[in-house]
């Protein structure tokens, strides 16, 4: 009987866990759908800003102020800024692993070249994975908020702008997972600074911009850096929720399979006990 009690207790426990994983799956699915809409709504704006910035590279750099030129030119003997975007929480499969692996490989390559490195880490999981080995490279660490991330984007943008203007860094690369679908996230290494020229020169020849107004280029640089952070953050969050949704779906299915096996085991044990009791009753009646 104690064996049956243990099985019933375990079935109850697994069912309770299944309810939690199912709820987490539904929450992640809802969040992912919302973020996908945000990505769709912001794509045109981000592409337009990036296009204008790449076109500026084709103009004479002497038309820009000294501070503005720092965002378009690689300055020798300055640190490489690596922005690492990971998750704040776990339970999202290998979401963070591919990012951390690529960052470590790139750091090793930069170290072999004798180059300086600075890290900006966004998300607790990335910080925990890198702080022990690369604590001396970490310039800033930001926790990822559950909702509204406007303040986070502002802080990261200000930090990047400050490092570039003060000639502490030259190259800036951001690492994040790009969303493809709920089951597939693509590890992405995207250069933010210096701004790269559009490789399709025909586009630049066909478009013409007149840059007028005080601080117009500086304002555009601000918008560009902010848009790059926003793009990476949205992609990363959609990927994280997709990975978590898939992980929780798998956990829910596994729990369901385990419950079926435990119920079958419980029924067989009960049948065995009943059979034994019947045999004992029959044997007792025959003895009488």
Positions of the model-derived regions?
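C-terminal beta-strand-loop-alpha-helix "lid" module of Rossmann-like NAD(P)-dependent dehydrogenases
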Residues: 1-288
